[in-house]
């Protein structure tokens, strides 16, 4: 499992959440490297990326076994499948600054979630802390920008 997903799984356990729905595309890209449209679900035991069927093949080609993310086509999920994603989950986190009220109600209805809990920007706070790879990429981008101005 990649380090960012592992970190988030540990974090949600530490704040007494059983699962989390990540729908902000920026946070999904940060956690997985995926840029395709969809939602990321960190369940009790498994991680799912639910997307439109047009993206399933592309997403599967980018993920590795180590990512431990199951890719599902939204059209292939029955109501029972959706409900089972959060089976035995008492508290499910969501991104309160990104999710609209109508989407909140949709999550409650579609996934039969008992208690959706605001996560208070836990991913955004972690994104602010840069790892070595991110610092390297920022430095490279700055150097390219400097070269443009010198030209």
Positions of the model-derived regions?
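Residues that cap or initiate secondary-structure elements
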Residues: 46, 55, 98-100
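Short, hinge-like loop/turn segments at secondary-structure boundaries
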Residues: 37-40, 66-67, 134
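Compact, glycine/acidic-enriched structural inserts
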Residues: 51-80
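Short, surface-exposed linear patches
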Residues: 41-45, 62-64, 70-74, 113-117, ...
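Fold-independent oxyanion-binding glycine-rich loops
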Residues: 23-25, 52-53, 96-97, 121
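Flexible, acidic/His-enriched mid-domain "rim/lid" segments that flank
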Residues: 3-5, 76-151
């Amino acid at each position: 499992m990649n380090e960012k997903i592992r970190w988030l799984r540990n974090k949600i356990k530490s704040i007494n959440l059983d699962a989390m729905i990540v729908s902000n595309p920026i946070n999904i890209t940060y956690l997985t490297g995926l840029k395709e449209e969809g939602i990321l679900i960190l369940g009790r035991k498994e991680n799912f990326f639910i997307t439109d069927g047009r993206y399933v093949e592309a997403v599967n080609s980018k993920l590795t076994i180590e990512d431990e993310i199951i890719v599902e086509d939204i059209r292939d999920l029955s109501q029972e499948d959706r409900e089972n994603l959060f089976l035995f989950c008492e508290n499910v986190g969501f991104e309160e600054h990104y999710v609209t009220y109508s989407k909140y109600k949709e999550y409650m209805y579609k996934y039969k979630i008992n208690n959706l809990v605001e996560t208070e920007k836990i991913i955004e706070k972690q994104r602010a802390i840069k790892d070595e790879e991110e610092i390297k990429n920022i430095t490279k981008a700055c150097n390219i920008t400097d070269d443009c101005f010198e030209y």
